Regions:
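Short, well-ordered beta-strand core segments
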Residues: 27-29, 133, 167-169
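Solvent-exposed polar/charged
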Residues: 20-21, 125, 162
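Conserved P-loop
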Residues: 1-72, 76-79, 83-88
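Structured loop/turn residues at beta-strand edges in well-structured enzyme cores
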Residues: 72, 129, 162
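Conserved GTP-binding G-domain of TRAFAC-class P-loop NTPases and closely related GTPase folds
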Residues: 142-218
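Residues that form or immediately flank small-molecule/cofactor binding pockets and catalytic motifs
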Residues: 34, 50-53, 138, 172, ...
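Low-complexity, flexible helical/coil segments
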Residues: 41-47, 65-72, 112-118, 167-173, ...
Length: 218
């Protein structure tokens, strides 16, 4: 069972920038949208998009991610930005509906739910326990104004938060970037009691080290 951590936040809040604290030799960055990082360094970014192989058969982003997670020797993986896995597949399904009218609205969300949940289950059930997978994810607000992970449709509501023990919110205030770590009325953030202070530096290194120390993994 791998260790799944979610970093959620708006664009520009510092989700991706927090990678800079990690040693490039120890982290594998899987990008669902961007080709480059917002900082210099010898980091390798593997972009995944739906494509076709040389025989014209579809090769989906989800399958590429699983292959990278399974085959790499790295222990830390960042999937940035996992929101686009949902949005890109939604656009593909809309295209299918336009072409053949076989993908109705509810079925579209059922498919989205299945593929995203299947990826989370793969991370939690099939990867070794010394692996860390960090999902960088955009945010939205529910009907009460509470900040939560952005999903497509209602089928996936709260799935991400329910699937892991650590959900942090990236925020910026007066030019300072930081993570909120504890459950509150403002957002669906959470972490085990005593793992982190309520507010910590915008640093994946700090997050992973705190996690390891809490569970005696060092």
């Amino acid at each position: 069972m791998a260790n799944l951590i979610v970093i959620m936040g708006d664009s520009g809040a510092g989700k991706t920038y927090s990678i800079k604290s990690l040693d490039p030799a120890q982290v594998s960055i899987i990008s669902c949208k961007k080709n480059r990082l917002p900082f210099a360094g010898n980091y390798t970014v593997r972009k995944v998009v739906d494509t076709v192989d040389q025989n014209g058969q579809p090769v989906f982003a989800y399958d590429q991610i699983k292959m990278l997670l399974r085959s790499s020797q790295k222990k830390i993986f960042v999937i940035d930005d996992s929101t686009f896995l949902l949005k890109n597949e939604q656009q593909r399904n809309i295209g299918l509906k336009i072409k053949n009218d076989k993908v109705n609205g509810f079925m579209q969300y059922e498919v989205l739910s299945f593929h995203f949940k299947d990826l989370i289950d793969f991370i939690l059930d099939e990867l070794p326990e010394d692996i860390f997978v960090i999902l960088m994810h955009h945010i939205t607000k529910d009907e009460t104004g509470k900040v939560k992970t952005e999903v497509v449709g209602k089928v996936l509501d709260s799935l991400i938060e329910k699937s892991c023990d650590v959900v942090l919110l990236a925020e910026v205030e007066n030019g300072e970037h930081y993570f909120l770590t504890e459950s509150c009325s403002y957002a669906t953030t959470k972490s085990p009691e005593g793992m982190f202070p309520p507010r910590i530096a915008n640093s994946l290194k700090t997050v992973i080290e705190g996690y390891k120390k809490y569970y005696g993994m060092e």
